[in-house]
Amino acid sequence: MAEKTFKVVSDSGIHARPATILVQTASKFNSEIQLEYNGKTVNLKSIMGVMSLGIPKGATIKITAEGADAAEAMAALTDTLAKEGLAE
């Protein structure tokens, strides 16, 4: 299992476009990948789930991945969050 906490730095938070990018990245992996914010946890492969969280700038989020490719999934998601200027 891989787990990592991030701080959202994007001025718009995680809205439709970045949520889509995260879901696309997560969907490349077989692991179960969850996104947690404000006490709620959703499947990171679900665009509706991610959008339902309404994650603003400054929020602390946690991503967990469990499965055979969990480490690779976490590395890809960490890279995507950094490259897109979403979180650090």
Curated annotation (Swiss-Prot):
Subcellular location field: Cytoplasm
Every HPr domain range: 1-88
PANTHER family referenced in this protein's UniProt entry, alphabetically: PHOSPHOCARRIER PROTEIN HPR, PHOSPHOCARRIER PROTEIN NPR
Recorded family membership: Belongs to the HPr family.
PTM-bearing positions, type Phosphoserine: S12, S46
Organism superkingdom: Bacteria
Gene source species: Geobacillus stearothermophilus
Active site residues according to the UniProt entry: H15
Activity-regulation annotation: Phosphorylation on Ser-46 inhibits the phosphoryl transfer from enzyme I to HPr.
One GO-annotated biological process of the protein: phosphoenolpyruvate-dependent sugar phosphotransferase system
Role summary: General (non sugar-specific) component of the phosphoenolpyruvate-dependent sugar phosphotransferase system (sugar PTS). This major carbohydrate active-transport system catalyzes the phosphorylation of incoming sugar substrates concomitantly with their translocation across the cell membrane. The phosphoryl group from phosphoenolpyruvate (PEP) is transferred to the phosphoryl carrier protein HPr by enzyme I. Phospho-HPr then transfers it to the PTS EIIA domain. P-Ser-HPr interacts with the catabolite control protein A (CcpA), forming a complex that binds to DNA at the catabolite response elements cre, operator sites preceding a large number of catabolite-regulated genes. Thus, P-Ser-HPr is a corepressor in carbon catabolite repression (CCR), a mechanism that allows bacteria to coordinate and optimize the utilization of available carbon sources. P-Ser-HPr also plays a role in inducer exclusion, in which it probably interacts with several non-PTS permeases and inhibits their transport activity.
A GO-annotated cellular component: cytoplasm
Entry keywords, A to Z: Cytoplasm, Phosphoprotein, Phosphotransferase system, Sugar transport, Transcription, Transcription regulation, Transport
Protein name per Swiss-Prot or TrEMBL: Phosphocarrier protein HPr
Location (main, coarse): cytoplasm
SUPFAM superfamilies named in the record: HPr-like
